[in-house]
């Protein structure tokens, strides 16, 4: 009988190993009515701290331009949210009681460990990365959340990468428990100089799909016209609403299917088409919205964004949606089409069950995982199941970490 798995805690140290941040998770779920709180612990070397303070910041930023173009003080980045927490010495206000995880970490790490706590506002966007082009370098565009811990006499004092800890977390959403109604759409096209029509009806078998799941598109055509339907095209399109200084919408096909199914005049046609949107088929498309990712980890197409009813429509960031388009290619022009909106997301994981591996992830033989698990002895029986794991990433062969501040001790 195997041992009970321990509580996994992520840790990351500054390059000089004087400061270490501990977090219970890297993904924080937006439940629409609330967002998981960010609770962690920072451990500092007292000889290094001296008379300085320990600060922790949480930043949500939208990078909308290449990092190598940040010149002359002009940055293609907008901070959507910044919060600061003074972990040590504690502020005079009544301290917030530590969470259960923080309490266990404080007992295990000792007197030089200090808790910090953040509440993520509900109106902030989820983590989304825009897929870079083959020649793009530096940080990818998109929305990300970053925690930074450092020692300084004041917030205005400039901190250096060597003595600070920076780690990226994600704000995510999971599929709702109750999906919406089955999507369906229909249209009738009347042609010039004719009273006979072409009717198209399409539907999906459900509204909610998980990443990697095929979509079944039911197409029904009633052709009472004198024209012939030469082809039927089915495509899945991703729509990304970029809300920053102004709102712009970008669409990108992520799956396409074309069949030479003909529908003659005065006849009917019915068929179910199966199509699957996958990131693996869209690796070269620059600007495609992907789920926010930690560096050198694989990911998937961006999940649909769910906005709470009555929420502020002017939320800054990237709002993602999907539609299936069914198009009839008609002889002598006059094509007919309909669109079916649907939701593409990850299922809500059960407690203590990790998020399923992305469908587009590389084989395990190609992506060695450096978890560097460390388990410490303790006198507290309730703390025996804590397992510390470096805030590591999946290393891809042939790639190296070019950010000095991402090196782990």
Curated annotation (Swiss-Prot):
Modified residues (Phosphothreonine): 382
Gene Ontology terms for molecular function: angiotensin receptor binding; D1 dopamine receptor binding; enzyme binding; G protein-coupled receptor binding; molecular adaptor activity; protein kinase B binding; signaling receptor binding; ubiquitin protein ligase binding
Protein name in the entry: Beta-arrestin-2
Biological processes per GO annotation: adult walking behavior; cell chemotaxis; desensitization of G protein-coupled receptor signaling pathway; excitatory postsynaptic potential; G protein-coupled dopamine receptor signaling pathway; G protein-coupled receptor internalization; negative regulation of canonical NF-kappaB signal transduction; negative regulation of interleukin-1 beta production
Effect of residue 382 to A/D: Reduces interaction with CHUK
Compartment(s) where it occurs, according to its Swiss-Prot or TrEMBL record: Cytoplasm; Nucleus; Cell membrane; Membrane, Clathrin-coated pit
SMART domains from the UniProt entry: Arrestin_C (SM01017)
Modified residues annotated as Phosphotyrosine in this record: 48
Keywords: Cell membrane, Coated pit, Cytoplasm, Cytoplasmic vesicle, Hydroxylation, Membrane, Nucleus, Phosphoprotein, Protein transport, Signal transduction inhibitor, Transport, Ubl conjugation
UniProt-annotated stretches for the region Interaction with TRAF6: 240-409
Residue(s) carrying Hydroxyproline: 176, 181
UniProt domain comment: The [DE]-X(1,2)-F-X-X-[FL]-X-X-X-R motif mediates interaction the AP-2 complex subunit AP2B1.
Chain location of the short sequence motif [DE]-X(1,2)-F-X-X-[FL]-X-X-X-R motif per the record: 385-395
Database matches in Pfam families: Arrestin_C, Arrestin_N
InterPro entries, sorted: Arrestin, Arrestin-like_C, Arrestin-like_N, Arrestin_C-like, Arrestin_CS, Arrestin_N, Ig_E-set
Domain of life: Eukaryota
Keyword Ubl conjugation tagged: yes
Source organism of this protein record: Homo sapiens
Cited PROSITE patterns: ARRESTINS
Record annotation: effect of changing residue 11 to A: Abolishes interaction with CHUK
Cellular compartments per GO CC: clathrin-coated pit; cytoplasm; cytoplasmic vesicle; cytosol; endocytic vesicle; endocytic vesicle membrane; glutamatergic synapse; nucleoplasm
Post-translation changes: Phosphorylated at Thr-382 in the cytoplasm; probably dephosphorylated at the plasma membrane. The phosphorylation does not regulate internalization and recycling of ADRB2, interaction with clathrin or AP2B1. The ubiquitination status appears to regulate the formation and trafficking of beta-arrestin-GPCR complexes and signaling. Ubiquitination appears to occur GPCR-specific. Ubiquitinated by MDM2; the ubiquitination is required for rapid internalization of ADRB2. Deubiquitinated by USP33; the deubiquitination leads to a dissociation of the beta-arrestin-GPCR complex. Stimulation of a class A GPCR, such as ADRB2, induces transient ubiquitination and subsequently promotes association with USP33. Stimulation of a class B GPCR promotes a sustained ubiquitination.
Family, similarity comment: Belongs to the arrestin family.
SUPFAM superfamilies in alphabetical order: E set domains (SSF81296)
